Amino acid sequence: MANILKTIIENDKGEIRRLEKMADKVFKYEDQMAALTDDQLKAKTVEFKERYQNGESLDSLLYEAFAVVREGAKRVLGLFPYKVQVMGGIVLHHGDVPEMRTGEGKTLTATMPVYLNALSGKGVHVVTVNEYLSERDATEMGELYSWLGLSVGINLATKSPMEKKEAYECDITYSTNSEIGFDYLRDNMVVRAENMVQRPLNYALVDEVDSILIDEARTPLIVSGANAVETSQLYHMADHYVKSLNKDDYIIDVQSKTIGLSDSGIDRAESYFKLENLYDIENVALTHFIDNALRANYIMLLDIDYVVSEEQEILIVDQFTGRTMEGRRYSDGLHQAIEAKEGVPIQDETKTSASITYQNLFRMYKKLSGMTGTGKTEEEEFREIYNIRVIPIPTNRPVQRIDHSDLLYASIESKFKAVVEDVKARYQKGQPVLVGTVAVETSDYISKKLVAAGVPHEVLNAKNHYREAQIIMNAGQRGAVTIATNMAGRGTDIKLGEGVRELGGLCVIGTERHESRRIDNQLRGRSGRQGDPGESQFYLSLEDDLMKRFGSERLKGIFERLNMSEEAIESRMLTRQVEAAQKRVEGNNYDTRKQVLQYDDVMREQREIIYTQRYDVITADRDLAPEIQAMIKRTIGRVVDGHARAKQDEKLEAILNFAKYNLLPEDSITMEDLSGLSDKAIKEELFQRALKVYDSQVSKLRDEEAVKEFQKVLILRVVDNKWTDHIDALDQLRNAVGLRGYAQNNPVVEYQAEGFRMFNDMIGSIEFDVTRLMMKAQIHEQERPQAERHISTTATRNIAAHQASMPEDLDLSQIGRNELCPCGSGKKFKNCHGKRQ
């Protein structure tokens, strides 16, 4: 272990030496750039673009380009990037993460690689965690980019598609991570290419990269359509039942945060809902409602996991930032269960139309890099999942902050009493204090205690983050006391007021350890920026979540034996023990995220195939007849092959029924037309007849443009409909294969195999529906102005309304379970009409 650690440290040192040499080369151009007039310096951008177009690489332009940005920043912003900032910029250009402490000027560091990569004309996305930071950075740094001749756009959620398109067309686009994700998904749902807003994803520079790529890695971005099923009554019934339970009726696993009914709880459910057996297959839907009601009432906590807004809406609280996540909802019915619990209006359940996780969104960029002050603890994850290295950059000035050992108390009450006493003492001498909490509830509790102690203060949490930048900016003034949930105000520097350095600088007080060391380091890093003095102190209790999960029972005995109910234990060993517990949690969380990625990679591969083919259809300016006719041919082949083993009469009857109801006019083909033909000949006969019907159908459309439009809408509507159903099916499969793990099967392998089979089935189903709709759609010749609208609505109506029909006189007893159903649905018999037998 010691040897591995030594190797890592030596590698980091070698990398720093290499970066220093590269930074020195940038500095060699300093005098040359300083001698240029403003117009000459601005003209460098045009020169660099021409050199790039003529085959020079961005790497070869780096030294001059960085020097131009340094000189430009000095003239426009009055800021001159330090050597460490140039080093950080080089790391960013190479697609890695420079770990730079708070206050080291990450925003200015980013200007150099952003400028360099924007010269390619392919677009650079600067990604921030919220729109306030996007607007702030785009306004401040945009001044420099515009002066140097580059265009800057800001992509906000409130902008129209046209405004978004303009923002993405700029050389540099500032946006939040969520908005880029949603724009990507929406672009892959449009019917016309001109409605797409994004260009191909080229280079992303992610601010607070650990927050977005690690903390929110598993967060799926979901575009949903409303589900019409009215289920609010079931949510209320399940909630009412769950609220009637005693503690013995359910079992909670604190460590994994799972809950289930005990035997007595099951008995009560069967009595309450008047059932013979709660876990009968007919009651699967009901158990889903009960499970969600249990989680909502006994796992999900008000003011910690969510808050109730003034508009009576349930808002999720981000566990890492303490902010509410506007527009986000828990999926799978949990959000509705919480709404029932809190007695607010229950919103309709939704159906997923498209989804992607941040992990897979950002892996789609040709080049990805990011900035953080605390990335080294997650280095393995950055490397394994994103192929990114984390390189610690030295501080411009030595860190002066004093990090005190943790103080451990027996109870939460004695811990908070000590916190309030410490804050009051520091307030009285004028030293500013920032108190970090992990939950809104804790912030409110400490606030009440400080009011009682006569200490004026500001509270920054999920309930009032609109004022967060202003509150954080004042947090370093003399006598300021600020309470903040976790990393609220991240991205805004706390600058020390007059006379504060002499008082010891900003003191950061943590009220409990987070399960991630990185979040604790971020809180500490609010103090001691740019060589300022500062202090940090964490207060813990045996009743904290982290301590309860890992070994507080042993320490509890020590406190009781020594009769130390109000006193604290302070030792470096304790701090190391806590960090060891945190490492275990981080390891568990990483393993979980890695497994999620294995599942999500199945969806990613399938999504890329669908979206690529969808894009080809949208952007095609030609007749799509070859593609549609190929689908018709493959569909005929599947149906004929699906009945290859049946008796001749049964086979011909099934194929004839398929042709009548899905392919040809009903009276245009008889049994005699097919008898005596080989399977190959039957396929060819049906295909040739289908081509005539196809020609007849398209001839009803007025002109070539109408044909193209009809073809596009037809294919896209079918694909979107089937893909949406497939996403839901994959979600259900994922839940189901988890149970197979208990049968000694690897659930990921099962998911991959089953997901692949389902995808192939979906492709067959898409081609079947396109065939059926193309051949059976009621197309009427239209005047040109109405044609487009008619085409769209006809295709949509057919797709939505056309149900697979089964001839009444057909004998189903001879059809094999794995043969295609003769109704023409494209499904296997066992999954269609065979299921009803």
From Swiss-Prot:
What are the subcellular locations of this protein? Answer: Cell membrane; Cytoplasm
Q: Which residues bind ATP?
A: 85, 103-107, 493
What terms describe the molecular function in GO for this protein?
ATP binding; metal ion binding; protein-exporting ATPase activity
Task: Tell me which EC number(s) this protein carries.
Answer: 7.4.2.8
Alphabetized, the UniProt keywords read: ATP-binding, Cell membrane, Cytoplasm, Membrane, Metal-binding, Nucleotide-binding, Protein transport, Translocase, Translocation, Transport, Zinc
Q: What is the reaction catalyzed?
A: ATP + H2O + cellular proteinSide 1 = ADP + phosphate + cellular proteinSide 2
**Keyword Flavoprotein belongs to the record:** no
Q: How is the cofactor bound?
A: May bind 1 zinc ion per subunit.
Checking Pfam families in the record gives:
P-loop_SecA, SEC-C, SecA_DEAD, SecA_PP_bind, SecA_SW
Q: InterPro entries recorded for this chain?
A: Helicase_ATP-bd (IPR014001), Helicase_C-like (IPR001650), P-loop_NTPase (IPR027417), SEC_C_motif (IPR004027), SecA (IPR000185), SecA_CS (IPR020937), SecA_DEAD (IPR011115), SecA_motor_DEAD (IPR014018)
UniProt signal peptide: none
Give the UniProt entry's GO cellular component terms.
cell envelope Sec protein transport complex; cytosol; plasma membrane
- Looking at the keywords, is Membrane present? yes
Which protein family is it in? Belongs to the SecA family.
What HAMAP family has UniProt attached to this entry? SecA
Chain's role: Part of the Sec protein translocase complex. Interacts with the SecYEG preprotein conducting channel. Has a central role in coupling the hydrolysis of ATP to the transfer of proteins into and across the cell membrane, serving as an ATP-driven molecular motor driving the stepwise translocation of polypeptide chains across the membrane.
Q: Which PANTHER family match?
A: CHLOROPLAST PROTEIN-TRANSPORTING ATPASE, SECA INNER MEMBRANE COMPONENT OF SEC PROTEIN SECRETION SYSTEM
What is the protein name for this chain?
Protein translocase subunit SecA
User: Which gene produces this protein?
Assistant: secA
